[in-house]
């Protein structure tokens, strides 16, 4: 079980507030400075108690032995992975805006005061709004999965699967969840993120006048889709990184 630290909690807080913040700045004429201040307050309200009460996990301890420490310390890997996540958010949001799907969806189920800023959106303006979310996605999804990979010689010996004696849960796990620890961690982190993001975004959207549940759920689902795509990319990144792991 992963130990949640101030880094994980801060990244999760940023990601769960990102959809609502983007909605406010793009469709409700809330300034980016005001939205950024709100996120900072939320991050600090969770991060400070976590920092005081919980120790750092191995991924954030420079002297802790990790098989993939070189990937966590690689500036190139960290920057490119952040840009990858940012790019996914930009493509999803830009595609939704330019196809008319996102605007039509929000207009139908939200009481949107103006679409002017939405029509003025460009990929660059979206990058500015979601770049921090891209960095947070890398920190919450990719880095813990890198850190979860056990050192050589420390893996728990796998028990051979015997269909004749296996229980139903063991059979289901073998057929549908037979992944290494890195992939399991990535799936776990993605599930946690999407659950918190979906529930939190729906709840916050419902505080806006004129919002219907279907609209709030649909908008949150768009971000869940983006996070799932990012996780799939990071799964591939982790697989390709296996060729360069240090033993």
Map each language-model feature to its residues.
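Alpha-helical transmembrane segments of secretory-pathway, organelle, and plasma-membrane proteins
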Residues: 1, 18-21, 34-247
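Long, mid-chain structured domain cores
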Residues: 24, 29-34
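Long, hydrophobic/aromatic-enriched structural stretches that serve as scaffold segments
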Residues: 1-26
């Amino acid at each position: 079980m992963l130990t949640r630290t101030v880094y994980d909690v801060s990244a999760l807080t940023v990601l769960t507030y990102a959809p609502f913040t983007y909605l406010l700045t793009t469709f409700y004429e809330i300034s980016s400075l005001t939205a950024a201040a709100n996120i900072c307050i939320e991050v600090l309200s969770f991060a400070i108690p976590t920092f005081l009460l919980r120790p750092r996990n191995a991924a954030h301890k420079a002297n802790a032995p990790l098989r993939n420490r070189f990937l966590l310390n690689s500036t190139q890997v960290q920057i490119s992975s952040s840009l990858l996540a940012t790019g996914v958010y930009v493509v999803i949001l830009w595609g939704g805006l330019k196809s008319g799907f996102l605007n039509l969806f929000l207009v139908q189920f939200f009481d949107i005061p103006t679409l002017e800023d939405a029509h003025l959106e460009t990929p660059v303006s979206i990058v500015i709004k979601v770049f921090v979310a891209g960095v947070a996605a890398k920190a919450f999804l990719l880095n813990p999965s890198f850190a979860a990979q056990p050192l050589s010689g420390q893996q728990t010996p796998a028990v051979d699967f015997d269909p004749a004696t296996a229980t139903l849960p063991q059979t289901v796990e073998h057929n549908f969840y037979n992944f290494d620890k890195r992939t399991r961690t990535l799936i776990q982190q993605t599930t946690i993120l999407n659950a918190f993001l979906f529930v939190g975004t729906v709840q916050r959207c419902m505080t806006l006048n004129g919002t219907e549940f279907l609209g709030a759920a649909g908008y949150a689902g768009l971000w869940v889709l983006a996070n799932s795509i990012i996780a799939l990319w990071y799964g591939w990144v982790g697989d390709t990184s296996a060729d360069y792991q240090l033993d």
